[in-house]
Every structure is written in structure tokens, then in C-alpha cells.
């Protein structure tokens, strides 16, 4: 219950002088703050107050003494005034106030006026009483005086626990020894008003800290409290600090972020989240919008609703200031980030420029070396030009010029390689080469100049060319040198050369074949040599010409090879014409034809023999007369001399047709006239010895001789009971057995040879892998039949590589071989291909 109604005046207003004695019952902020304060002033209720409450009487005359030294104000006593003449001096009054201040306990009035309960004020005529208990002062002064002459129990207990007098307390005697010194303040001013109040002991135990640092720290602390919470909360605000390294890391990350798309940067955005419509012209402008509240909206309306005491009002809100501060912070961060990027850019630029400086220095040194080398090269070239002047004192020779070019190539290779060697050679070397070969006779001394030209080939020829052809004239100095300087001498010599005198020309080209370019050699053979040979073959007559044609055609085979094939057809034609009236008794035909056997293909050679030689041999063998008593063997010898020239099958065919029928007929007639079997045996063995093993191994020849043995055995067996030459039957049986055994041994030996050949071939095939495709099979068959199988360089048909199989041109497509016909390509079998190639 409030007592405010007791202190109202007649008009119902409270008296201002009575505010100090008014006490409200509501809970104030001071009550909340001093709820747990043990030093707050408490009012102890007496028994009378507890009984009568607010109606308890106050007896000012019988008030009990209090420790405060003051009595409660007696408002019933008359008002006393202090005379001005009796007023104490300033010094005495100050002393009394000091004593009062020292003795006055902490009361509620010492706290701020707005924090404690308001008391009833007294008028200016009232003074607080300074009286205390009447008899308590002296008693307190003598309290504990018995300790002056004896030791207390505490001292004894400490000594029992190990205390040593003169040392500090604690396990390690870390306590203080001397009591804390006190220093009396000079006046009544505040702390620090009269200078430092620290004692000597305090200065020793706690050295003086830097006052400026303390002041700065205190200033920063107070500065952070410039906006104070009106609720009285002492909670310190939390600050987040960003270091420079964090800002640098943030800047490095932001550089990696992708830039917004250009399409989105031009989009019109209408913001209707506020009180009014706002228009932005890009999404990036939305991020720059600050959180300033709309005008006209009360601050209280923007705060979230809270209940009771938790509803706290902010001290004051300054969104513009916060926005400006945020802008300053962001600008500072951007400046730091930009400075870091600029610093990194400058560092990178320094590194880049240092590298460029090093590279530039290297380039400069290289250019200086190049300039020095070029000046030396220029000096050598100028020396060559000076010595090439006509009527000079020291004319330049081809060997000396080669040594100068070798110096250029060895010491100044880069400059020599990059220089235009063609122009340099044309200006210097060509005149010297012309002068060197002006008296040259190639057919007399074919190797003249090969050494010096070989040296110039290594100096002038460009090894980087992919193809060496006539198109290299503009880029290769050596090819141009040989074509423009050396080739005219060769043309003059070939124009005066006789093809029948082939050896000097062949030796000359053999000497220069490895020096001159390939295309120049091909040009010589195709355009100069072959036309001369073709013309000479057309003029050759085998019947009247005493010089065999092979003597001046075949020496060109190593150089020209397949280029000579167009000459073979007219040669065969002329030889066929010459053999029309030939008789086997003329051995010159064999001498003329024998060199051509290895040149012509097996098929063409066999065809030539069957057309021109075999019929003549058959006629000769048909004229042979077999007479056991008087045998003329000339015709037989003429035929058998051609055994190596014609094939075994052709020779066996001649024997089967023209020899064995007559020979068996003579044998039968001889056996029917009581012959001498010993003579028949000798005659049989004599004729058999006239044939070579290759002919005897032929099955047809074996059959004929076995037939003769059978005839002899039948003749011996059929004459049983008649007169028989003693031992004839045994001799014929022995002869038959011997011949059969020889045939068996020969067949066994042939089989063994074939097995060995197959074994060796199998080892070779296993070592070189079995043919896995049709092309490998054709190549294997070509090797077995001694047929040339090789690709035609630069020739294709429908993207397929062309090959030469003997004289036939073929190509392979998906396991099928195609042969070139008259108008189209015809597929054929492998065996037919082999027969056609032969």
C-alpha cells in the first residue's frame, strides 16, 4: 500500500519537500540491479512495526542508538537556525565533514538518485544528526587488547602446519611477508587528484605500466560505447575483424568468379517490394540497394513485437550513417584488394620483364654472333670473287673453292644452310666446273672428276628434299650444277658413241651412277642410250653380223634392267627368222641363243624353243638309225646337246616320239633271233648311260627302260625247252633286279631331298612367319618358281597397288588377283597366273 495520501496538501498535490520520505512499492530498476548486492542498505522491521504497520508511533525521544552516528530526523521539534556569527570556520567545517564522511556507512543516498527509492526531503533548516551510541565508542577501542602481551591461537596453528616466521604463506612460501602498506590521501579530492597514490611496496610488486598504452586502450574501450543501450545492459558489442590476408584471399577468389552475362546486365527490373515502385536497369543494381527504411514508417512499427521486459528499444537508429559506414568499409576493402592485385600485377610484370630482358639479351648475343659470322662469310665470298677476276695474280681453282665451301659448312653451318646456295654456286662454282671439264673425254677417262664432284655433292646437295627429281632444279644447287654444266658434256659424247662399243660407255656410267642424281641417270638411259640401242637392234642382222647381239646388249642389263625388254621382241623375231633354215648340226645357234636363256622369261624362252628348235631336233632324231652292229651317234649327240636349252618335258617328248619306238623295235627283233644276252645287256646299259640322271628320273623314260627289261625277261622265259645260253636267265634276272633297286634308291633319295627341303623351308617360314594373306602367298609362289614379284612404283588402279608378276601386271583386291587384259582387268587363279608368267 502506498502512503502518498498522507503527504498531500489541501489541493491534492504532493509536497516537494516530502519526496525524500515517500516510498513506492513498485519494483524499480535499482531493486533489480541490487537484488544480489550484499552491501545494499536493508531495513530491519521491528516488532512494533510488524504489529502496527503504518500506524506505529514514532517516539523520537526514546530512539535507540544506531551505528551510523546519526539520528532520525525529528520533525516535531521546533526549527533551529544557525547564527552567522557562530558559524564554524572553513577548516573546522571541512574537518567535521571529513570525519562524517569517514564514519558514514554506505546508504541508499550514495547511489544515483534515479536508481534507489526516493526518501522524504527535509528542509534546508534541518541538519542530520551525528550522534551515535552513547557508550559504545570506548568499548570498541579496547577490543582485543589482551593480544598485545600474548600470542593468539592462530599463530600456534600456523606454526603446527609448517609456517616459518619471516617467510610467506603457501607451499612454496609465495605469500607476502610484509602487510599491505596504505597511503593517506592529502585532501578530499577524487582518486588520482593529488597524483599517484602508490606506495613503495606497490611499485616493487607491480611495476608501473605504460600509462599511454592504458589510456589509449581505455579510450578505445570508451569510444566503442558511444551508442549506449538505454536498457542499461552492460553487454559488450562483438566486432568482426578482417585481416589484410583475408581480404587478399577474398580478392583472389572473386577474380575467379564468372562475370554476369551481358544479356542479364541489360534487363529492366521493376522492384515493387517497397512502398512505391522502383525501376532498376540491371540485376547488379539490386545488390547495391541498401536497407534504409521507408520514410513515414514509425520505428516502433518496424520492430518485431516482444512481451514484457524483453521489449527493448534501440538507443537510436541511423541507417544513413550505417550505409555510409558500410560504403566506406567496402570501398576500403576494394582499395586493399585492388592494391593487392596491382601489386601482384606489378610483381608479375617485373618477372615478365626480367624474362624478356634475358631473352632479349640472348637474342642480342645471337644476333651479334650472326652478324660476326655473316661478316666473315662475306669476307670469304668477296675473296673468291676477287680471285675469280680474269688475269688475276692468284686465280681460284676448283679444289681451293671446295676447301672454302668446306670452311663455310664446318664453321658457319647455320649461315651456310640458310644462305641461297644455288645463287652462290651459280656465281662462283659453275664457271670453275666448266673450266675443269673443258678438255674431258668421258669414254677415254670415265672416272675423271668423280672425286671433286663427290665433294661438291656433299657441299651443295640439299638433303631436306623429299623427292629428287627435275623439279629440284630451282632449290638444289648440285642438281642444277650437274644438269647445266656436266650434262652437256655427256650429251655430246653419247651423240658420237657407237652402241656396239658399249664397254666404255657402261664403265663411264657405272663410275658416275652413285654421284649424279637419279633422275639425271634415268634421263641419260631413257633419252640418250635406249634410242641408240633400239636403232642398232633394228639394223642388226643375225645372218650377216659377225658380232653377237648379246655382246653389246647384255652389258646394259645391270644399269637398264627392265628398260631393255622392248628390245627382246625384235631380237626373238630376227632369231626366229634366222633359224628357219638351221640344222641341229650347226652348233653356232646354241652359242647365239644360250646367253638369252637367263634374260628372257621362262615362258617366252620355252615358247621360242618349241617354235624354232624342238621341231628341228625332232626331225634330226627321226633320221637316227638304230643299228646294234654299226651305230652312228651324231644325230643323237646333236639332239642331246640341247638338253640344257630345252625343258626336260620337251626332250622326253622327243624321245618318246622319235627314239624309244625304234629302239624297242630293234630290241624285240634282236631277241627273236637267238641273241647273245651278254651283248644285249651291254647294249641296254650303253644306251641307258647316254641319258642324264634328270632324264632317267622322268617317269616316261623309266617306263620305257622297264618295258625293255620286261621284254628281255619274257624272251628268256619263253624259250623254255629250247637252246638257251648258259647263265642268260640269271643275268637278265640280275640286271632286272639291279635296275629296279637303282630306281628304288633314286626315288628314296629324291624323297629324302624333298623332305629336307620341306623341313628347311618350314624352319624358314616359321622364322619369318607363315603367310597370312593372299599377297604373301603369291610372293611365296613367285620365289618357288623363280618369278620376279615387285610393286610398280607410283602406279595404282582404283586405289589398289599394281605389281609385276614376271612380265604380267596384276593387282590384288579382297583375295582375288586380277590380270591386265587388252581392254579390262580379268580375275584369274594362282596356277593360271604362274603358267602365264612362265
Swiss-Prot record:
Residues 14-29, 92-101 have a biased composition (Acidic residues). The modification Phosphoserine is found at residues 2, 60, 96, 99, 145, 211. GO terms for molecular function: nucleic acid binding. A motif (Nuclear localization signal) lies at residues 701-706. This is Tuftelin-interacting protein 11. Involved in pre-mRNA splicing, specifically in spliceosome disassembly during late-stage splicing events. Intron turnover seems to proceed through reactions in two lariat-intron associated complexes termed Intron Large (IL) and Intron Small (IS). In cooperation with DHX15 seems to mediate the transition of the U2, U5 and U6 snRNP-containing IL complex to the snRNP-free IS complex leading to efficient debranching and turnover of excised introns. May play a role in the differentiation of ameloblasts and odontoblasts or in the forming of the enamel extracellular matrix. Belongs to the TFP11/STIP family. Its main location: cytoplasm. The gene is Tfip11. PANTHER family: TUFTELIN-INTERACTING PROTEIN 11 (PTHR23329:SF1), TUFTELIN-INTERACTING PROTEIN 11-RELATED (PTHR23329). Residues 1-74, 86-137, 193-237 are annotated as: Disordered. Residues 150-196 form the G-patch domain. The keyword Isomerase does not apply. It comes from Mus musculus. GO terms for cellular component: catalytic step 2 spliceosome; chromosome, telomeric region; cytoplasm; extracellular matrix; nuclear speck; nucleolus; nucleus; spliceosomal complex. Residues 1-13, 45-65, 102-117, 218-232 have a biased composition (Basic and acidic residues). PROSITE patterns: G_PATCH (PS50174). It is found in: Cytoplasm; Nucleus. Signal peptide: none annotated. The lineage of its organism: Eukaryota, Metazoa, Chordata, Craniata, Vertebrata. Keywords: Biomineralization, Cytoplasm, mRNA processing, mRNA splicing, Nucleus, Phosphoprotein, Spliceosome. GO terms for biological process: biomineral tissue development; cell differentiation; extracellular matrix organization; negative regulation of protein-containing complex assembly; spliceosomal complex disassembly. Widely expressed. In tooth it is expressed in ameloblasts and odontoblasts. Residues 711-735 are annotated as: Required for nuclear speckle localization. InterPro entries: G_patch_dom, GCFC_dom, STIP/TFIP11_N, TFP11, TFP11/STIP/Ntr1. Residues 1-51 are annotated as: Required for interaction with DHX15. SMART domains: G_patch (SM00443). Identified in the spliceosome C complex. Found in the Intron Large (IL) complex, a post-mRNA release spliceosomal complex containing the excised intron, U2, U5 and U6 snRNPs, and splicing factors. Interacts with TUFT1. Interacts with DHX15; indicative for a recruitment of DHX15 to the IL complex. Interacts with GCFC2.
